[in-house]
């Protein structure tokens, strides 16, 4: 049984990665219903939260059906991060996660996210301040290092465990790599092989199929896997991996009707959370992913991303169903 503090996650948990502008409550809802064991909010700027910026505050929204769920924070100020840990604790999550892995320029160049991989003493001090600011378990997500010459994840794992984090997720690339090339899980495996390490270690990067999940589980010995981009428009990946790990057999992939059903559920959650206009606008980024692989889908997508109402979107999706099922443009 993998545990983070007192949170029981099963024998080999599958985590949904925190993704900016993606892993909001509606997206988390469809991932949870399709097998995600632990989820996180989008990462929240500590500076934005202190300023009471509306976007940052709204990211604190969590719902009981999502549990267990963590709030992920990032920032460059130790004091601000500690204060935001207190604010986040009051929002009622199951844990607090610190982002030391975001590679994007807007974050790293401000001394946050993956930038802390260049200043391990500050990373340790920041983590200690967050641990001391909350009664909740604190976890960390990071990368192998800043670049190929500074892959310091072994030191990071030991030092962060020593000051009290309860789990560590490692993306198998450096900051300089961004999302290019292949993720290197061999260094993640070395963390697990370290006799000093006793917290759960989760691997992240390039898991996009049940076969790869099984291969990486067996090869690298991690306690669980965090899935990010592969779940966008395809929340079924969690249950597909679980079924394959348990039986060695594949679940049937979702047919077109199932894709439409879950897409509409996602839209309904989005409208419920952000209102009619906001929910419809937020959903527009997801249609292409839900219907990836369909030939001739572009005209339908153009209508979906300009439609102003749920009813109209529902009509369009019914047209999608009729077009593809009747014309046999897709395996259903």
What are these regions (language model features)?
Residues 1-332:
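Flavin-dependent oxidoreductase catalytic cores
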